[in-house]
A protein has these predicted regions:
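Structural recognition of the beta-strand scaffold that forms the well-ordered cores
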Residues: 1-2, 40-45, 89-90, 117-120, ...
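Surface cap/lid and interfacial helix-loop subdomains adjacent to catalytic sites
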Residues: 70-84, 105-255, 259-260
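An acidic- and aromatic-residue-enriched active-site/binding cleft used to recognize and process polar
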Residues: 46-49, 93-95, 120-124
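Extracytoplasmic/secreted cell-surface and envelope-processing proteins
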Residues: 10-12, 53, 98-100, 127-131, ...
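Short, well-ordered amphipathic alpha-helices
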Residues: 28, 99-106
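Active-site catalytic motif of lipid deacylating hydrolases and related acyltransferases
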Residues: 2-86, 219-260
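Gly/Ala-rich beta-loop-alpha elbow adjacent to hydrolase catalytic centers
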Residues: 90-100
Length: 260
């Protein structure tokens, strides 16, 4: 029990203890919100690589196999002990998306038939990977099944972090052409939403670069250390589109169940 002369200190101490005991509590609450409370989710611990890893190829070669092995083992456990032959959605962001692609490349036919969709967010999927892996099927709309959703958001093409992705879709209007879509949302997850003015942004897919061009974004606190770049919105790929992603997961799941 923590006592204090002021409620503010008690709250601050409670938050500090919560962060130390449950370091990923905020992230898991965010995932729970993304799933609308209508789906269960399985999010195992794994030995995640630091941002420093991606500054040198030799670091990636040495460290990523450890993370990949952890997630593969966790997915096998999920299928054997938890899933019970039910439909499922795969979702990963950045490093998690890279590893998720490894799961797709090894997935057997029976498991794939139960996969509603895969969301590989904030990663590039090369053409040769798509050609090699029949389980990676590019999403073409809002409700297709067994597909992979992928996108990367930037101010313009010069801000890209990765090479062109062969799989890309606009998560606001769920189109793969250049049709623009209006996105209105709070610009940053670092402040309470009630304290923010919403940005009105225009999002369109640039077919030549395979990137989402975002006009009208006001935040300045998005640049990642070590690997980030001004005008690249990698750290906000889920935050900006969270409402669209939530609705889309629910739609794809409903369509999948309707077709069974």
């Amino acid at each position: 029990v923590i006592t204090s002369e002021t409620g503010t200190r008690t709250i601050m101490l409670t938050r500090m203890l919560t962060v130390r005991v449950f370091p990923f509590l905020g992230e898991m609450q965010g995932v729970d919100g993304l799933l609308s409370g209508d789906m269960n989710f399985y999010s195992p611990y794994y030995r995640q690589c630091s941002l420093e890893t991606f500054t040198k190829d030799r670091y990636v070669a040495k460290r990523m196999p450890v993370a990949v092995r952890d997630v593969k083992n966790a997915f096998r456990f999920y299928l054997a002990k938890i899933n019970r032959d039910r439909p499922f959605i795969l979702a990963g962001f950045s490093q998690g998306a890279m590893i998720m692609l490894e799961l797709l490349q090894e997935m057997d036919v029976d498991t794939y038939r139960r996969m509603v969709a895969a969301y590989a967010i904030g990663v590039s999927i090369p053409e040769e990977t798509v050609t090699r892996c029949p389980r990676i099927v590019a999403a073409q709309g809002a409700a297709d099944q067994g597909v992979t959703v992928c996108y990367n958001s930037v101010r313009d093409a010069s801000c890209a972090l990765w090479d062109k992705s062969a799989v890309v879709i606009n998560p606001v209007n769920w189109r793969t052409d250049t049709t623009s879509a209006l996105l209105v949302t709070e610009p940053t997850p670092r402040l309470p939403v009630k304290e923010q003015q919403k940005d009105t942004m225009v999002v369109h897919l640039d077919v030549e670069s395979g990137l989402l061009f975002v006009d009208g974004y006001s935040a300045t606190d998005y640049v990642l250390p070590l690997i980030g770049r001004e005008g690249n919105y990698h750290s906000r790929e889920i935050w900006l589109y969270r409402d669209a992603l939530r609705e889309n997961m629910a739609l794809r799941a409903a369509e999948f169940l309707r077709g069974r």
